[in-house]
């Protein structure tokens, strides 16, 4: 059985959501509705549905993570399907596709989404009628769409990005609706965080990936997302951006390690390479191979190189990484004083030091930069409490190699 989970503080569109469930070919489902707020009246047509279960207890909960957790904890199904109270499932085969994916061993199932703008307009007879229009995201961020027709209405579905550390690191590029968890994967990942007011699904997707669960795409668009002025994603945009940024900073390295294991990519650690006798003065220009590594780590090593060697290291690392592979660099930050902490250090770094490798204008001025990276993070880190207490900070740059692959986020080079 699939348990469809729907919190609601405004049941205005529940009948449409209900219709999208009734029109499914797969009928082994229950609909768990969790009212959250005062004076919530569930439509009679929904209450008459024998597969509906209304769960009390959410009316005094304030965080969406707690409300969704209550819904999942109250569900009877083998898997949980999230359906927002103002959205719809694509009719016919959506639940069947989801069930098939879980039968094949998936722990998390997701689909493409068609977003539509919805508003009431006045027609030529002065009557208020609904208006539906397609909505798409900026192609500058890597988004692609394709046409679909649902209920006779032309819409545009947005193609999900491949599951990578980069796409999972921010809610904007993570799998959109529909999002579904097997019961096993949900609880092994820890379930929804009841402390989160937004981004609860984003954190749970990260935890699910890190738990080792299999992610599986339904193969097409199976969700219709209604966009209007009162969407939570618009009203709480600043809070969402702040939380998703904190998740990106906290979890990117763990996501990279999980991704390496899932795809069999190797990691090259420059400190370990130096321990084998590798000498950048003699061997740097030989490079590290081509499309060979998923992650290259240079932890407090680049400050020991000359400036031209840093440039050649960046070119060589780029060549050695697979498309979309990751480069992590930690260096002392010059303005805190730590950049001159050793008389033998030859290069000095600030937050702008990766600009020649991530921004076209800076690369063009250098003339010998052949690599193309997207900077994901520039973090202030401290190797020890002593460094922190004295304000001696380091910078950790986390970047992805741009080699022509479809890639989430703006590319400046």
Where are these regions (language model features)?
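N-proximal low-complexity "stem/linker" segments adjacent to membrane-targeting elements
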Residues: 1-20
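A recurrent flexible, glycine/aromatic-enriched loop bordering the glycosyltransferase active site
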Residues: 139-181
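Glycine-rich, basic loop-to-helix element that forms the pyrophosphate-binding segment
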Residues: 58-75
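Conserved donor NDP-sugar-binding/catalytic core segment of glycosyltransferases
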Residues: 95-148
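Acidic donor-binding loop at a coil-to-helix junction in glycosyltransferase catalytic cores
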Residues: 198-204
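Catalytic beta-strand/loop signature of glycosyltransferases that borders the donor
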Residues: 112, 215-222
């Amino acid at each position: 059985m699939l348990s469809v989970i729907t919190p609601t503080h405004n049941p205005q569109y529940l009948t449409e959501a209900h219709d999208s469930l009734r029109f499914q070919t797969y009928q082994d489902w229950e609909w768990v509705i969790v009212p959250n707020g005062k004076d919530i009246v569930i439509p009679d047509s929904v209450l008459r549905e024998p597969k509906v279960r209304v769960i009390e207890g959410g009316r005094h909960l304030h965080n969406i993570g707690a409300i969704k957790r209550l819904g999942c904890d109250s569900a009877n199904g083998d898997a949980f399907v999230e359906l927002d109270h103002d959205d719809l499932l694509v009719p016919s085969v959506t639940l069947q596709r989801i069930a098939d994916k879980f039968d094949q061993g998936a722990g998390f199932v997701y689909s493409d989404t068609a977003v539509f703008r919805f508003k009431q307009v006045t027609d030529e007879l002065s009557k208020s009628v609904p208006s539906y229009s397609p909505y798409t995201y900026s192609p500058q961020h890597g988004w692609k769409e394709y046409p679909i027709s649902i209920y006779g209405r032309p819409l545009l579905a947005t193609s999900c990005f491949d599951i990578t550390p980069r796409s999972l690191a921010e809610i904007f590029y993570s799998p959109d609706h529909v999002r579904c968890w097997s019961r096993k994967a949900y609880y092994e990942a820890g379930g929804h965080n009841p402390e989160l007011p937004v981004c609860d699904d984003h954190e749970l997707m990260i935890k699910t990936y890190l738990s080792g669960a299999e992610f599986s795409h339904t193969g097409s668009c199976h969700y219709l997302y209604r966009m209007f002025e009162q969407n939570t994603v618009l009203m709480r945009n600043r809070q969402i951006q702040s939380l998703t940024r904190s998740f990106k900073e906290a979890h990117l390295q763990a996501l990279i390690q999980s991704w390496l294991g899932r795809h069999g990519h190797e990691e090259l650690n420059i400190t370990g390479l130096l321990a084998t006798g590798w000498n950048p003065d003699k061997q740097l220009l030989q490079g590290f191979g081509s499309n060979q590594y998923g992650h290259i780590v240079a932890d407090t090593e680049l400050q020991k190189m000359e400036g031209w060697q840093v440039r050649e290291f960046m070119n060589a690392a780029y060549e050695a990484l697979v498309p979309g592979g990751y480069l992590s660099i930690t260096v002392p930050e010059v303005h805190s004083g730590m950049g001159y902490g050793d008389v033998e250090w030859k290069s000095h770094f600030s937050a702008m030091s990766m600009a020649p490798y991530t921004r076209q204008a800076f690369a063009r001025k250098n003339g010998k930069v052949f690599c193309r990276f997207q900077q994901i993070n520039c973090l202030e880190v401290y190797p020890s409490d002593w460094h922190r207490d004295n304000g001696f900070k380091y910078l950790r740059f986390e970047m992805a190699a741009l080699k022509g692959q479809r890639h989430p986020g703006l590319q400046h080079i």
